[in-house]
């Protein structure tokens, strides 16, 4: 695959890339601040994320003219803020049916689920840092929801969808 180098692209064209870099960095730093361990695989991407191992992924869904939550309700002038819809997903291994065909105990299932509850709550604490991009800066607000997917392939994925302004 020939990956195109963007180092010479006009800086104005890098706003979305820089946002994705920043959201990933802020997420990692925030989880570290709360002493919540993260998988070593950490990245951002465009579109849906394949879940094939433990990982932290930031994925781009869309960008639009207008404030967070004000998507296409009225025609917008070109000078208004842009908002991006992103998903921050954290996939972790969970107890599954063993090679002997025996299901994990309820205690093991609950113990394996505890980190997903922590992940969902830390995501909701993180939103302040995504709204206030710079320290002591007042943001335009965010829209955020956190949810947990069905167990799939031995993984549980906690995802926060966030709509935020592009700084």
Segments (PLM) and residue ranges:
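Extracellular/virion structural assembly segments
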Residues: 2-13, 18, 77-83, 91-125
